[in-house]
């Protein structure tokens, strides 16, 4: 899945579950806009080469989630 946060970060990973604490992803790669580059380029690179795992597990608080879509539904 692709999870976008309200702060502009994007995560690509395996959706595990929604808990009281937020959305739990496993084997996720993260994009931070402050680090430079573009979200679209990050997603194109991930589609081409696969997920570069930055986080074995990451819990994103529900209040920070701006969107969640299946990776295959993206138009790259």
Indicate residue ranges for each PLM-predicted region:
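Conserved RNA-binding domains used in RNP assembly and mRNA/RNA metabolism
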Residues: 1-76
